[in-house]
Amino acid sequence: MAIQQLEPEKRNKTIHVINTDTLVESPIVAKWVGKSLAKMQETANEENLPIVTHRLTPAVDNTFWVNLRGRGYPFPRKKLRWCTDRLKIKPVNDFIKNKIAEHGEIILVLGTRKAESAQRAITMAKYEKKRVRELLSPNPTLANELVFSPLENWTNDDVWFFLMQYKNP
């Protein structure tokens, strides 16, 4: 929405919209995400928006079934969440590292919110202290990446109000 309001000559930075497919989502969810990314890309093209969508997946040796069945890892649980890093974080970090190598630096926009959980609020508060500008923090694990969290103070009601008020492209 904000990008649509910019004059076309000011839309000079490519915006990469990423989704990480763990390859263990239900077929209904996977299909919906695929259609959403395709529709988002189609709308971006029609409206001349500098948006490129990406569906990221883990490397074969990091997939759920290779690790669970092939390597004998225990089923993930709260205290042993081996899958989060391999299925979600690593594909995203690899993508980001490639973009940093290409452009020198990036800004990652995340929809994380303090209201998601008590642990999320604690983690976000920790990074708040290191901010370089309002809602903009350095990533502690990747150099040359800033993290922008515009929704950090949104409540669950704020999210639902927004989703009901604005049509998804």
Language model segments and positions:
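Nucleotide-activated chemistry modules centered on ATP-dependent adenylation/adenylyltransferase
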Residues: M1-P169
